[in-house]
Amino acid sequence: MITALVPKPYRTATHYVTVPNCDNGTLPVTVIGLGQPVLLLHAYGMDTREFLPFLLPLTTKYQFYLPHFRGFGLAKSIPLTQFDFLGQYAEDINAVIEQICSWRDRDSIAVAAISMGAQVMWAYFERYGIEKVSRYLNIDQNLAIHNQHDWQGGLFGTRQTEVFDIFQELLDAGLEYEHVDSFNHLPHTLKRRTTDTERMFSLLSASQPRSQAFIHLMTHKTDNQLVFYNHETWKHKMHCLQAYLALPYDFRHVAETLTIPVVNLIGGRSQLYDPKWQSRVTQMLPNATEVILPKSGHAVPLDAPVGFYKVLKGFLENK
């Protein structure tokens, strides 16, 4: 009854797309709006519905498709079946794009993606090309995860070794508990180490004091709270971390194939991907324009919500 009072452009619905190598067969996709179809991909640890406040003013012109990556949001119970999680996510997104094009009778659609979601798109472009994507908005994501002799633009920049060592120590500490499914059954020290590491990652993603204060507020757990904390995505996040550390994830060779229009949105204070190296990505892309939000870190919607909305709106309007 209440839902019926909400105008159609502002209502959300959950659609399900058949994807390969999935026990229940389908992946949930949150859909909102009326108009041109747009695919929007979320970041690591994010619920895709966190995009909704930015989309509401645009829902009379665009219909947004927000897939939930396996292990997160409405798909938190859907496991990965491959170690290469970016590759499996790319397979899922290929199925989603094919289905949207079929539903909407389109040859291609616009895509916007942030952080891990953007890394998934590099993997998608490597496997499936650009035929089904008309335009692409890449949000604070580089082409290669690991620093190399000819590439120092990897994750965490000059601090990569330091931060990756922290991740590896956490993974090593959890090895003997691989058989444990519930976070509640882990020893307190490992639970604390896990939540502290996640908080560190989140704080590195933000640059604005208000954003960091919000992260502290949302992630702080007292010892008593930690006892009962049901961390449902714990194992999935560890899987992703293992893959990030072990697999090369270098998509630089893909850049020259992206002849479609690309907008490269960069957080000018990003600590996850050095803005100077992100600008090199712009130069490597044949048909790219660059937008820098000078006061934003990696978490662009959190640090610069107005700027993020304006760039997204401009991208959709082809401005």
Task: Please provide the spans of the model-predicted regions.
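Catalytic histidine-centered segment of alpha/beta-hydrolase-like enzymes
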Residues: 296-305, 309
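Active-site loop/oxyanion-hole signature of alpha/beta-hydrolase fold enzymes
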Residues: 56, 66-112, 116, 125-129, ...
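Conserved catalytic-core motifs of eukaryotic protein kinase domains, centered on the activation segment
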Residues: 50-52, 75-81, 148-149, 275-276
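Flexible "cap/lid" loop of the alpha/beta hydrolase fold
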Residues: 134-186
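Alpha/beta-hydrolase fold catalytic core
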Residues: 1-39, 59-63, 87-88, 101-104, ...
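Alpha/beta-hydrolase active-site loop signature
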Residues: 45, 69-73, 118, 143, ...
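Conserved serine/cysteine hydrolase catalytic core
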Residues: 210-283, 289-292
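Conserved HGGG/HGGXW glycine-rich cap/lid loop of the alpha/beta-hydrolase fold
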Residues: 27-77
